A protein has these predicted regions:
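Basic, polyanion-binding surface patches
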Residues: 1-145
Length: 145
């Protein structure tokens, strides 16, 4: 699913919060099925990501239009996207804030990564067509595990 904002909430179990506009086709599917796959693309897919975000699944088949291929997920009915660096199978664990804030809380129940992608350059939406591309890693002292 295409979304422009998400946040890690917890690590054990992995919990993610995300905003999905109630105008989006995905919003109703997420409320009805209570599951999804968060697909994590790299910069090479940026044009397709914007295309998916600017169109509606009510009107077009995004997989066909943007030439994305799917694989079967193991825990949910939504498909994985083969071209993405990672796919996170999720189930909705809390939708109490969906009606007012479009905010869903998801538990990641299965994660997939492309092992051939050693240093993924993921993209992060800043709003209004602006993205940051991940790249440089810095390491600082930490007591976190």
């Amino acid at each position: 699913m295409t979304m422009s904002w998400h946040t890690m909430i917890d690590f054990e179990p992995p919990i993610v919060g995300c905003i999905v506009s109630n105008r989006n086709f995905t919003f109703n599917i997420l409320k009805a099925t209570k599951e999804c796959v968060i697909n994590i693309p790299t910069v090479e897919l940026a044009g397709k990501v914007v295309g998916c975000g600017n169109t509606s699944g009510r009107e077009i088949d995004k997989f066909k239009t943007f030439r994305l291929t799917t694989a079967e997920a193991s825990k949910v009915k939504a498909p994985l996207i083969n071209e993405c660096y990672a796919n996170l199978e999720c189930r909705v664990v809390d939708a109490r804030m969906a009606a007012k804030y479009n905010f869903f809380i998801l538990e990641v129940i299965k994660a997939w990564i492309d092992p051939s992608c050693k240093q993924p350059r993921t993209i992060h939406h800043r709003g209004r067509g602006m993205f940051i591309v991940a790249g440089k890693t810095i390491r600082l002292p930490s007591k976190m595990k």
